[in-house]
From Swiss-Prot:
Residues that, per the record, bind Mg(2+): 69
Family, per entry: Belongs to the RuvB family.
Gene name per UniProt: ruvB
HAMAP family for the chain: DNA_HJ_migration_RuvB (MF_00016)
Annotated region described as Small ATPAse domain (RuvB-S), given as residue ranges: 185-255
One of the record's GO molecular function terms: ATP hydrolysis activity
UniProt keyword list: ATP-binding, Cytoplasm, DNA damage, DNA recombination, DNA repair, DNA-binding, Hydrolase, Nucleotide-binding
Name of the molecule in the record: Holliday junction branch migration complex subunit RuvB
Domain comment, as recorded: Has 3 domains, the large (RuvB-L) and small ATPase (RuvB-S) domains and the C-terminal head (RuvB-H) domain. The head domain binds DNA, while the ATPase domains jointly bind ATP, ADP or are empty depending on the state of the subunit in the translocation cycle. During a single DNA translocation step the structure of each domain remains the same, but their relative positions change.
Annotated catalysed reactions: ATP + H2O = ADP + phosphate + H(+)
Domain of life: Bacteria
Length: 342
């Protein structure tokens, strides 16, 4: 695998990805939400620039779609440094990592997405690079093999993960800065929707933006996706103007309810209610019943349902709460109303 294959070029994407790239903020001032993280990172960046030093290695974690990659890009822009992007699964061998590290310029930022998926050999190779900016590689084979230590330019590693608990302690402890991204509130999401609409030249009223924000499950990526789909609906039905009624109508067609739950979320809750008497039920059993992978439920479904108080995770499995029954219009397991019965 050549070095160029190991890096992700953000310009080499389809049109949808280019749209996503175009609406990303490029500075902390334009980065909406996550105020505690922003204020801390601004302080750390100013201190590093004042010392003319590298920024400490950063670990950013949180549920998918909250802006980990965007924040890494913003940090690179604020530091006025180069930005190289790769991902844990791509780095299969120590040589893959070495090919990237030896091409870095001084003070560059290397971003590794899904860093929890680094294999053991690559992770071990990374340790001296993080601590001492040195790289130990094995040259030759068999009895003729020997270790060579290479000097690396000073750099900053930014790792992103949705599963911080899967990182080994030695790797986690080598990050000087650890930031947790949290779900966004509705007001911040409304601002994100309005900002994206302005960049994409989408006509939207304030109440229309609020309706999309309320159904975006606290996640900017979902807010921007829903904005683009509601735009499609408005282009056909409402002369391209997104107002509240059009947003509601479009989101009902997309089967996104007022709490932001999509069909997979409702299937998850309904199966626990109807097949397993409200739980508890093991995740593997639940995944089989739904026909989805365990990781999909853990990463994409459960975090928001837990945050909204719809499910509980216990040692015996998953159980639903009274709030879930109330939201789906059920009392003691009997359906009294179906929002999407049409």
């Amino acid at each position: 695998m050549i070095e160029e294959d190991l890096l992700i070029d953000e310009k080499d994407h389809n049109n949808e990805d280019l749209v996503i790239t175009s609406i990303r903020p490029n500075s902390l001032e334009n980065y909406i939400g996550q105020n505690d993280v922003k204020s801390q990172m601004m302080l750390f960046i100013k201190a590093a620039k004042k010392r003319k030093d590298t920024l400490d290695h950063c670990l950013i974690y949180g549920p998918p779609g909250l802006g980990k990659t965007t924040l890494a890009n913003v940090i690179a822009n604020q530091m006025s440094t180069g930005f190289k992007k790769t991902s844990g699964p791509v780095l299969e061998r120590a040589g893959d990592l070495a090919a990237i590290l030896t091409k870095l310029d001084p003070y560059d930022i290397l971003f590794i997405d899904e860093i929890h998926r680094l294999n053991y050999v690559v992770e071990e190779t990374l340790y001296p690079a993080l601590e001492d900016f040195k790289l130990d590689i094995i040259v030759g084979e068999g009895l003729a093999s020997h270790s060579v230590q290479l000097e690396l330019p000073p750099f900053t590693l930014i790792g992103a993960t949705t599963r911080v608990g899967m990182l080994t302690s030695p790797l986690r402890d080598r990050f000087g800065i650890i930031q947790r991204l949290q779900f966004y509130n509705v007001e911040d999401l409304k601002m994100i929707v309005e900002r994206s609409a302005d960049i994409l030249d989408i006509q939207i009223e304030s109440k229309g933006a609020l309706e999309i924000a309320k159904r975006s499950r606290g996640t900017p990526r979902i807010a921007n996706r829903l904005l683009r789909r509601v735009r499609d609906f408005a282009d056909v039905k409402a002369n391209s103007m997104i107002h509240q009624d059009i947003a509601k109508e479009a989101l009902i067609i997309l089967k996104v309810d007022e709490a932001g739950l999509e069909q997979l979320d409702r299937d998850y809750l309904s199966i626990i209610m109807n097949k397993f008497s409200g739980g508890p039920v093991g995740l593997d059993t639940l995944a089989t019943s739904i026909g989805e992978e365990r990781g999909t439920l853990e990463d994409m479904v459960e975090p928001y349902l837990i945050q909204q108080g719809f499910i509980m995770r216990t040692p015996r499995g998953r159980s639903i709460t009274d709030a879930a029954y109330a939201h789906l219009g059920l009392i003691n397991g009997l359906k009294v109303n179906d929002l999407f019965n049409q």
